Amino acid sequence: NNAVKVFKFTVKPTIGDVGIRVQDILLLDIIKNNLADRPIHISTTTGGDSNLGLDEYLQMQGLTFKLVPERIYETGNVVNEKVMREHLFNTNTLQTNNYKPYYQPGFKFRGLDDKSNLFFDDNHFRMMQSYRGAYLNLAGYYINKDQKDKAIETLNFMNKIISVNRVEMEDNLFFKMVMIYRQLGAYDQFSKYGMKFVDKVTEKIKENRVSLE
């Protein structure tokens, strides 16, 4: 069978309603010249407006989206579970100097737990939300597959290595996590993090740093 797989997508204007940006043209050129020969990945940190209407074909793998030749919403494979687990759970947190001269899957998290006293600036804060988003997406995958224990395990592990006491969690991610715990029946975690979220938002309201719209 020599049938050629074809996928179609619509590139919407990214400059008003009349044109597309230089970086969009560059990505189109990369896809055109490399799709048949090598994998193409787009960073999860670039924002949805950089995906050129390819969202249906972008599968999450760690902190990148891989361009795949099938609609992820039809297959249910919004994330690559095997790759995600390799990166998010193989963290080598107890072997902080375990560096190798070759590729090893897994993110190395250090100084992000309750025992740390490191300083974090806004760049660190934003990056940690990307990592947390990956854990939440993996948990969502397990929920859709009716694997509740793995979903709870994923959230618990995330909170162990990236403590909300050390690195503040964005309000929308925090609320999403709390409600997932509730959905899964993990009421101890729901109560614990729910109270932390309420305290956090209450403090912001007092300081006029939160919008209730």
What function would you assign to each model-found segment?
Residues 1-213:
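ER/secretory pathway lumenal C-terminal domains and tails of membrane proteins involved
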